[in-house]
């Protein structure tokens, strides 16, 4: 693979936009990375990142493209909330303080998934992106993401890889 288009970079480009959208812009990053595999590649294949968002939220993101098990998990804690997600549309839970337990959060009425991919890869987001693009071209919708936002995310990815 090419360093400019490596698997880790691709994962950052998928994960960082929605994390920024949900938790706010990135204020600071602390990154640990290395080439952990014996693969003959010219880039690191394991990253552990501590992210501080402008909102004050702290989070960690691990990107590992060599593990035999593909994983995508998220836990978010705050004084007033707790969210757990195991990467697939049916595994998002939020803590209900009144019920003192977790309840499922429904993301989609129907999930589009290709069997060849891991369970956490669903096609719904790609479809929604295309609908928004066509609506924007036709003047019926505003773009959900801008080139300026892309440029900012790419700038953070460059800093992560530095």
What are these regions (language model features)?
Residues 38-44, 54-128:
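NAD(P)-dinucleotide binding in Rossmann-like oxidoreductases
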Residues 4-6, 117-121, 139-143:
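Active-site rim elements
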Residues 25-31, 58-59, 83-84, 143-144:
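Acidic/polar loop patches that form or flank catalytic/metal-binding clefts of enzymes
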Residues 1-40:
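Predominantly a Rossmann-like dinucleotide-binding segment in NAD(P)-dependent oxidoreductases
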Residues 12-19, 85, 123-130, 150:
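A structural signal for well-ordered alpha-helical scaffolds and beta->alpha junctions
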Residues 125-162:
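C-terminal helix-rich "cap/oligomerization" subdomain common to oxidoreductases
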Residues 15, 68, 153:
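Short phosphate-engaging motifs
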């Amino acid at each position: 693979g090419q360093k400019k288009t490596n698997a880790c970079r691709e994962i950052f480009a998928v994960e960082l936009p929605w994390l920024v959208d949900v938790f706010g812009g990135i204020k600071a990053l602390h990154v640990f990375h290395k080439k952990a595999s014996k693969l003959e590649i010219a880039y690191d294949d394991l990253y552990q990142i501590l992210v501080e968002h402008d909102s004050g939220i702290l989070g960690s993101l691990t990107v590992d493209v060599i593990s035999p098990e593909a994983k995508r998990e998220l836990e978010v804690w705050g004084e007033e909330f707790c969210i757990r997600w195991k990467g697939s549309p049916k595994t998002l839970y939020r803590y209900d303080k009144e019920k003192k337990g977790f309840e499922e959060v429904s993301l989609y009425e129907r999930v589009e998934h290709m069997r060849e991919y891991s369970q956490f890869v669903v096609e719904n987001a790609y479809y929604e992106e295309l609908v928004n693009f066509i609506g924007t071209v036709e003047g019926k919708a505003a773009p959900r993401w801008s080139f300026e936002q892309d440029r900012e995310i790419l700038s953070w990815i460059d800093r992560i890889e530095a």
